[in-house]
Amino acid sequence: SNDDLWSAIAGDFEAAAQVLPSSQPQVGRADKTAAYAYLAKTRLYQAYEQDENHNVVNINQERLQQVLDATEQVMGMHQLEEDFAYNFLPGSFENGQEAVFSIQFSNNDGTLHGRLNYSDVLATPQGIGCCDFHKPSQNLVNAYKVDEQGLPLFSNYNQSNLDFNSLENYRVDPRLYHTVAIPGLPWKYDQENIYQENWVRSPSTYGYTASLKENVTEDSEYLVNIDPFYGNSKNRIEIRYADVLLMRAEALIELGRQNEALPLINEVRERANQSTTLISSYATNTGISPYLDGENINWTQDVAREALRWERRLELAMEGNRFFDLVRWGIAEETLNKYYSEEAEEATYYEGAFFDEGREEYLPIPQAQINFSQDVYVQNTGY
């Protein structure tokens, strides 16, 4: 069953946590806290019990407690970087205090191109490489707007588009400028290299933004020409401490202990607010505020849940978590089909797009694996 498979995965992480050391002599090797962080993530997904159409029918309280138990082992072993940007810079910034587990890359191992991050070679903009894939949506950009109190515009954030020409009209979350490249602003903080509209692949179709987190500056020693593509050797953080804090907060909220989750979410927000060192020259209005129960927000369980989900979207944007979060919460269909419907008004390539609930939450199981299991595995619904 689905629950059996989650338990098998959790069992592997539990076993790893028992035998791995608290620290490793070689950089990049998994340690005890990494195992506990992944155990927490596994138990969090397992807690959301779903029917065959992936609707959440129960949130298992015992599993949520296991999330708290596992994250407790990570608390204090890592901490947030002083600046959000430091998680996404190469060289001395890699393997920092927030990185719980990272995939290691290099460009100096003696081979022609080194151990480059080939998974991101297509994410470099056309202006400095190829091929401008993995692009932030306009919807995501708009989500970084905040109100006069520095809180998210939960319900009306997408009523107008945020771009370079309208930045002065909005107050925004500083994380926008560490996540999204906007024409007219420096590329990866380089004042001598302004991100241009002509760097973009088919802008009239796909928009003018690009992803910043996995990229480096054009003159960086970590950017390597592997003609016709450009790769870089910057590590990719697979799980970081901010994610652990938000997983713990999510478990607390679903246990009805949202008041205990509040300082965890605020810890992430307060770090985001002070992450302005590298963007201080940008002529923009940035600044967000912590949630203050009874002052700027009424911190009920429902409100806390919405705030937590919003925080995960902004904090972890373009890091590969969003779709899986939506599936875990059982809201992939409603979220994505609403998105397709709204975006199709401006982005014509979304016309006719839809998310097939009960099928597209998961990929099909390869037939070879079903054969190897001697039909113990049953093909996912809809395939």
Predicted feature residues:
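Acidic/polar-rich alpha-helix caps and helix-coil junctions
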Residues: 1-117, 149-383
